[in-house]
Amino acid sequence: MAQEKSALSKAQKAAVLLLSLPEEVSMNIVKELSEEELQKLFALAKDLESVPEEEIENIAEELLDEIKKAGIKIKKPEEFIENIKKVIPPTLAEKFRGILELGDAEKILKEIEKVDSRILASLLKNEHPQTIALFLSQLSPKKSAEIIQNLPEELKKEVVKRIATLENVNVQYVKELAQILLEEISSLGAKEALKLEGTAVAAELLNTLDKETRELILQSIGQEDPLLEERIREKMFTFEDIRKLSDRDIIEILKVVDKNTLMIALLGAPEDIKQKFLSNMSKRAAKLFLEDMEALGPVKKSEIEKAQRQVVNIIRKMIDEGKIEIGD
């Protein structure tokens, strides 16, 4: 259905659009108009009757059609920032530039996430541990954990320790390092810092590792810096921490956790943790659950640990959402 042409003149349409824009937008336009242009607009505006919403929409659509016909293209964000520097504070312009840099870094890091973790580990292993820590802190915990598992043993501990003590990350630096890595991989076939809580990043990363590797790294860190080890552990939630949950919390977990995943997870669990779940089921449900567990037969240790991590991830998500609370 064709839109109905407005009977207003182009100058009147300009006045209508200006008056219908949000104040902060219209004020920026007004700053760019000459005194003569403003006088004309206000003269037209005072004579305008109330304009229906539908007509305002039609006028806006007409303007878009005119823009398309004229072949006007949207400015690059960098050019736009240069233009608006005239009417916004310098600090705000710098903030916008930082956002652009962050966006560029995120695009490059998305490409890095697709690269085989073993290749990334082999490229990173000769970098300084601090450089590796900075880089891994900007990747997903899963990807970071995979890379760490492929690093030399002594380097693993050093990298996690440095992640835990990070406070600021320069976006531009991470972006440049990621770009270099991508270039090296290809050859094989916000000015503002991001604020980080290093211990939280390290804890999230360690939670994705298998229990043996996790404990080895934590113990190594503890030998050099017991306080740092304690701070990391405080941020973590492990399968053994289920003991700290109340019966009410266990009931909430049972509502959302996959039954088969829980069965496999409990195959390798201490008896008290197993009973923690069974005691919060009805007698009939607990009996059926145990029968189904026995019917599973032998399960690989790696599958049990994977199931335990899945249960932990659900619990951590519920803690973050405030649905359950971890006790002392």
UniProtKB/Swiss-Prot annotation:
Any GO CC annotation of this UniProt entry: bacterial-type flagellum basal body
Highest taxon of the lineage: Bacteria
SUPFAM superfamilies: FliG (SSF48029)
Subcellular location(s) per record: Cell inner membrane; Bacterial flagellum basal body
Membrane topology: Peripheral membrane protein
Site description Part of the EHPQR-motif, residues in chain: 162
Keywords of this entry: Bacterial flagellum, Cell inner membrane, Cell membrane, Chemotaxis, Flagellar rotation, Membrane
Main location: membrane
InterPro entries linked: F-box_dom, Flg_Motor_Flig, Flg_Motor_Flig_C, FliG_a-hlx, FliG_M, FliG_N
Motif Part of the EHPQR-motif per record, residues: 127-130
Keyword flag Cell cycle: no
GO molecular function, one term: cytoskeletal motor activity
GO biological process: bacterial-type flagellum-dependent cell motility; chemotaxis
Function statement: FliG is one of 2 proteins (FliG, FliN) that might form the rotor-mounted switch complex (C ring), located at the base of the basal body. This complex interacts with the CheY and CheZ chemotaxis proteins, in addition to contacting components of the motor that determine the direction of flagellar rotation.
Family in the record: Belongs to the FliG family.
PANTHER family linked to this entry: FLAGELLAR MOTOR SWITCH PROTEIN FLIG
Protein name: Flagellar motor switch protein FliG
